[in-house]
Amino acid sequence: MFNLNFFNYTCHCEWCFWVLPSYNGLGLTPQMGWDNWNTFACNVSEDLLLNTADRISDIGLKDLGYKYVILDDCWSSGRDEDGFLVADEQKFPNGMGHVADRLHNNSFLFGMYSSAGEYTCAGYPGSLGREEEDAQFFANNRVDYLKYDNCYNKGRFGTPESSHKRYKAMSDALNKTGRPIFYSLCNWGQDLTFYWGSDIANSWRMSGDITAEFSRPDSRCPCDGDEYDCKYAGYHCSIMNILNKAAPMGQNGGIGGWNDLDNLEVGVGNLTDDEEKTHFSMWAMVKSPLIIGADVNHLKASSYSIYSQSSVIAINQDPKGIPATRVWRYYVPQTDKYGQGEIQFWSGPLENGDQVIALLNGGMKARPMNATLEDIFFDSYQGSEELSTSWDIYDLWANRIDNATASAILENNKVTNNTLYNATKLSYKEGLLNGDSRLFGTKVGTISPDGIINTTVPAHGIALYRLRSSS
């Protein structure tokens, strides 16, 4: 086993690079919701969106914060004689305004899709050069969110300046409409988006498209996990590939502008339960958007219980808005069938002086892992308050609902009182201040100043803890 890398990017005065506000007042926490693409691709319709929204509401996910219902590519039939986009009447017989109104009446927010190119990725009309009329189309149809892709861009990339200019055109057009529209860039991290995205957008993709694989290399995702400035982002990128690319980028994401690691693959494909937990945990840790990519009408109980784990969601929605940092990373000899094997330790500050830590085992065998306070508070000086304090340890997965409870909710299409946290009634910030146990997990011990947290982490699994001062 050998030391591969050590990332230490957190500022000593932790507020100093979080001073820029949201450029449009939106995105104060990472967005949460559902997008059709990972499961349904071009098979979209009014019924799909509205039925999915009903299901998200009925099984309690909306009240956990999954508020955006995002229609991806393939919704248009072209442009009218005035140059405005037209919705496909076969798929959306009542028009987009009707869909928006139905979603708004059920307390959802409506998202749509276009591309900063001549065409969308599926070959439908794109918005390059037509930003103002398309932004007005979205505003007229009461859209709350725009996912803006990168296909058929006529070669207008290659430098940060060229990509910034192309995406800023839509940012300006959206702002000009006067309607608050969350702006989500999907340019795959091309041209160092993490340096300039927060100037014009609320989130930005930082890699090629995700696939439901934990660690499998794929030639269609040619850059390995250490190539954060990937020149050819590709697609079919594994969870670990994307996570490793994201590791140094936390310093560039925060309140109002988030690094987007792509939609969640929990409930998509054949990931193990531990792999799904690791995936969800780490997206929460680095403050990526939590966008469900699965068919919520056919979720298995274990995947549903992951999406509904409010103690982990509370990490993602923490008002401090600081992504966790990867403190250390080692390769291990217990590799999986793809020859991949590593362990990692991540740590990050939370509101009210709390801290979140993750011990991640990317190897193929369960292994003991540990952390000291010097690991956890890696930027603290000797004798600092953090290192001389005892901390209560809360396991953020220990209070996960069991499969029987999850199955009953899914089968009955109803959540009984207090089974799940309701962030609509009480925000995560308020719930934590009130000490709601559903947001803390289960207390499993205390670490003293000279102590060590010891645990055994399963293959492709994670141990995730919230620490709170004992004093």
UniProtKB/Swiss-Prot annotation:
Glycosylation sites: N43, N105, N175, N270, N370, N403, N417, N422, N454
A Gene Ontology biological process term: melibiose catabolic process
Designated name of the protein: Alpha-galactosidase
Gene it is expressed from: MEL
Record has Secreted as a keyword: yes
Keywords associated with the record: Disulfide bond, Glycoprotein, Glycosidase, Hydrolase, Secreted, Signal
GO (cellular component) term, any one: extracellular region
Phylogenetic classification of the source organism: Eukaryota, Fungi, Dikarya, Ascomycota, Saccharomycotina
Keyword Transcription regulation (UniProt): no
